[in-house]
Amino acid sequence: SSGGLLLLLGLLTLCAELIPVSSRQRHRDCDKPPDKGNCGSVRRAFYYDTRLKTCKAFPYRGCNGNGNHFKTETLCRCECLVYP
C-alpha cells in the first residue's frame, strides 16, 4: 500500500539523518551467516548477506542464533549497510 511505502521511506530517511555517513560503523554481527535459531515459533526476519551486499528475508525461530537477524528490512539496512 502507499501508506506502507511512505512509512518505509520515512524510516530510511530517519536512519540516514540520525547516523552521519562518516561515523557509521556496521553492526558487529552483520558479517555472520544467517542462523535460524532453535525455538518453536517461526517468524520472518532479515539478515545481511555479505556476498550480495543486501538484506534478505529468512525464517527465524525466535531465539538464540546470532545477531545477524533483524525484525525489518529497514533495520537490517540501517545496521549493516555502510556507504563510502
Curated annotation (Swiss-Prot):
Species assigned in the record: Bungarus candidus
UniProt key word Metal-binding: no
Pfam family, one: Kunitz_BPTI
Chief localization: secreted
Gene3D superfamilies: Pancreatic trypsin inhibitor Kunitz domain
Compartments reported by the entry: Secreted
Annotated BPTI/Kunitz inhibitor domain residues: 30-80
Superkingdom of the organism of origin: Eukaryota
InterPro entries found in the cross-reference section: Kunitz_BPTI, Kunitz_BPTI_sf, Prtase_inh_Kunz-CS, TFPI/VKTCI-like
Tissues of expression: Expressed by the venom gland.
Taxon lineage: Eukaryota, Metazoa, Chordata, Craniata, Vertebrata
A GO MF term: toxin activity
Subunit note: Heterodimer; disulfide-linked. The A chain has phospholipase A2 activity and the B chain shows homology with the basic protease inhibitors.
Annotated signal sequence range: 1-23
Keywords: Disulfide bond, Neurotoxin, Presynaptic neurotoxin, Secreted, Signal, Toxin
Protein name per Swiss-Prot or TrEMBL: Kunitz-type serine protease inhibitor homolog beta-bungarotoxin B4 chain
One cellular-component annotation, GO: extracellular space
Keyword check for Signal: yes
UniProt function note: Beta-2 bungarotoxin is a presynaptic neurotoxin of the venom. The B chain is homologous to venom basic protease inhibitors but has no protease inhibitor activity and is non-toxic.
